[in-house]
């Protein structure tokens, strides 16, 4: 039986009504991943939160968006999502010595819009080490979910590997694939880094990633594609927005 850790979600515009015995609720979910003092104290270790056993694999926000992660029996994180409030350096600096947790550290001094907490996603190239779904609409049988967007950024580890190994022609791209239970597939993408003869660009600031082109979906799966195998598939996500409607 899968269990979830519950966190708050801000409903920006909510309408609920009862009509002939039916319940209807429509709102825009703004997922910021901020936690209470109790949650930071009891669930996070070294500023990172990973589910403690293979039965506890998801973050459930406002009952509807499910962010999945995969861990082994010994508790090692393998792929998908975890939460972090590790902070990096500003404006692309890499002056500090490398750390073992740089994979889970955003390469910015805070989360998006100054928030404390964000999620880190790892696209493990070994498929069996990944959760079945990355992001799931929990009430997909009772309503609809249309992702609107989020903020994304690189981790410190990725920024360091790019600096060490990227050459002209190399590129790092984040892809989001939306699917429904009937098989409809939609996609969106954003460039996280690109080296060309004219310019080298690396994402060092929280950047909007528009997801409305995915339309109404049941699941969103992420893929990090690099032309250079030395750059691992991590990225940071914060401020997830989705338009949700539930009826029952």
Feature annotation, model-predicted:
Residues 1-40, 244-248:
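Bacterial Sec-dependent N-terminal signal peptides
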Residues 161-174:
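Short coil-to-beta strand junction motifs in C2/discoidin
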Residues 143-163:
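Charged, amphipathic alpha-helical segments
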């Amino acid at each position: 039986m899968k269990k979830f850790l519950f966190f708050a979600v801000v409903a920006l515009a909510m309408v609920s009504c009862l009509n002939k015995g039916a319940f209807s609720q429509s709102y825009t979910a703004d997922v910021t991943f901020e936690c209470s003092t109790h949650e930071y104290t009891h669930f996070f270790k070294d500023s990172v939160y990973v589910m403690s056993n293979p039965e506890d694999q998801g973050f459930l926000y406002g009952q509807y968006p499910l962010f999945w992660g995969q861990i082994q029996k010994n508790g090692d994180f393998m792929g998908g999502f975890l939460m972090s409030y590790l902070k990096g350096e500003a404006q692309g600096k890499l002056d500090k010595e490398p750390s073992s947790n740089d994979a889970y550290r955003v390469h910015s001094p805070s989360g998006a819009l100054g928030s404390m907490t964000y999620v880190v996603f790892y696209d493990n190239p070994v498929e069996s080490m990944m959760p079945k779904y990355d992001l799931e609409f929990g009430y997909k049988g009772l309503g609809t979910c249309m992702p609107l967007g989020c903020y994304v950024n690189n981790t410190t580890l990725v920024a360091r590997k790019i600096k060490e190994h990227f050459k002209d022609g190399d590129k790092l791209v984040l892809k989001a694939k939306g699917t429904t239970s009937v098989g409809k597939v939609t996609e969106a993408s954003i460039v996280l880094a690109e080296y060309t003869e004219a310019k080298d660009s690396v994402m060092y600031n929280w950047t909007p990633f528009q997801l409305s082109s995915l339309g109404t979906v049941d699941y969103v799966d992420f893929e990090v594609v690099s032309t250079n195998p030395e750059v691992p598939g991590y990225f940071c996500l914060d401020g997830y927005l989705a338009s949700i409607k539930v009826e029952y």
